[in-house]
C-alpha cells in the first residue's frame, strides 16, 4: 500500500490555521487504479465503456464507507466513533509514499497516512474501542476529545493526555 502524491496530508486544518492537537488523515484507503462501474452513455470522459479504472478520493471514500458499513452491520451497538477507532487501531503499517521525483517508495509520516491502511477484517475483531460525541467536538479542546490518536503538538514544557477505552469482547 502506498500514498500517492496527490493525497491530502495533515496536520488538521480548520480553514484559518493548522491544528496540532489531533492527527489527520485518520486512515488511508485504496484510491488508485480502482476498477469502477461507468455509464456508457457518458460523453465527457470515456464513452461506451461500462467499467473504467479511476483514481482519487472518489474511489477511496467508497472503500472506507463500505468498511464502516460492514462493521456497523456486524456490530450494530457500535457508535460511529467506535467504528472509527476500530479502523484506526487496527490499521495496517507500513504505508509508503511514492516519490514525486523518481517514483521510488519512501517512508511516510503520521501526517501522510494517519494510523495506516484500513483493514476491515482486523477492525471487526478490534478488542478496545474509543468513544466520543459530537458535543465533545463542540465543547472540549481538541486535545481532550477521546480520539483513537494522541498528538502532542505545541507543548511548552509538559503535557498530559488521557483516553478512555472499553473492551469490545467482554461485558460486565
Q: PLM features: residue spans?
A:
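Loop-rich non-cytosolic ectodomains and luminal regions
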Residues: 1-172
Amino acid at each position: 500500500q502506498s500514498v500517492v502524491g496527490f493525497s491530502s496530508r495533515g496536520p488538521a486544518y480548520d480553514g484559518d490555521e493548522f491544528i496540532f492537537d489531533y492527527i489527520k488523515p485518520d486512515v488511508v484507503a485504496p484510491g488508485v487504479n480502482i476498477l469502477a462501474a461507468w455509464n456508457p452513455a457518458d460523453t465527457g470522459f470515456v464513452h461506451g465503456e461500462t467499467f473504467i479504472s479511476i483514481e482519487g478520493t472518489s474511489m477511496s471514500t467508497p472503500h472506507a464507507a463500505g468498511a464502516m458499513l460492514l462493521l456497523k452491520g456486524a456490530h450494530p451497538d457500535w457508535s460511529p466513533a467506535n467504528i472509527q477507532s476500530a479502523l484506526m487501531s487496527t490499521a495496517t503499517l507500513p504505508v509508503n509514499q511514492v516519490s514525486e521525483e523518481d517514483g521510488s517508495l519512501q517512508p511516510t509520516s503520521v501526517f501522510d497516512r494517519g494510523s495506516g491502511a484500513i483493514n476491515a477484517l482486523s477492525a471487526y475483531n478490534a478488542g478496545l474501542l474509543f468513544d466520543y460525541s459530537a458535543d465533545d467536538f463542540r465543547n472540549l479542546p481538541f486535545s481532550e476529545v477521546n480520539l483513537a490518536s494522541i498528538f502532542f503538538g505545541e507543548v511548552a514544557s509538559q503535557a498530559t493526555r488521557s483516553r478512555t477505552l472499553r473492551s469490545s469482547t467482554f461485558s460486565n
